[in-house]
Amino acid sequence: MGSFSMWHWLIVLVIVLLLFGRGKIPELMGDVAKGIKSFKKGMTDEDAPDTAKTVDHKADETK
């Protein structure tokens, strides 16, 4: 009862193929890849301005 055997995975694969068809699965995987790529780009875009915000502060001379 604990783990899936090879037959379980084959049955799941057949059901997925019947539901989505052969043409739809690559399309779905492409959409997932685009989403991951967009997420990574968004994460690096947020980090980039933080490193660019360096301010040089000059010390005031008082006598």
UniProtKB/Swiss-Prot annotation:
Cell membrane keyword on record: yes
Domain of life where this protein originates: Bacteria
Composition bias type Basic and acidic residues, residue spans: 53-63
Keywords, sorted A to Z: Cell inner membrane, Cell membrane, Membrane, Protein transport, Translocation, Transmembrane, Transmembrane helix, Transport
GO biological process, one term: protein transport by the Tat complex
Location of this chain's protein in the cell: Cell inner membrane
InterPro entries listed in its UniProt record: TatA/B/E, TatA/E
GO CC annotation terms, alphabetical: TAT protein transport complex
Gene3D superfamilies attached to this UniProt entry: 1.20.5.3310
Annotated segments matching region Disordered: 42-63
Keyword Transit peptide: no
Entry's Gene Ontology molecular function annotations: protein transmembrane transporter activity
Membrane disposition: Single-pass membrane protein
Record-annotated membrane-spanning stretches: 1-21
Record-linked PANTHER family: SEC-INDEPENDENT PROTEIN TRANSLOCASE PROTEIN TATA
Function: Part of the twin-arginine translocation (Tat) system that transports large folded proteins containing a characteristic twin-arginine motif in their signal peptide across membranes. TatA could form the protein-conducting channel of the Tat system.
Classification via NCBIfam families: PRK00720.1, tatAE
Assembly information from the UniProt record: The Tat system comprises two distinct complexes: a TatABC complex, containing multiple copies of TatA, TatB and TatC subunits, and a separate TatA complex, containing only TatA subunits. Substrates initially bind to the TatABC complex, which probably triggers association of the separate TatA complex to form the active translocon.
UniProt similarity note: Belongs to the TatA/E family.
Protein name: Sec-independent protein translocase protein TatA
Lineage, highest ranks first: Bacteria, Pseudomonadati, Pseudomonadota, Alphaproteobacteria, Hyphomicrobiales
Gene (name only): tatA
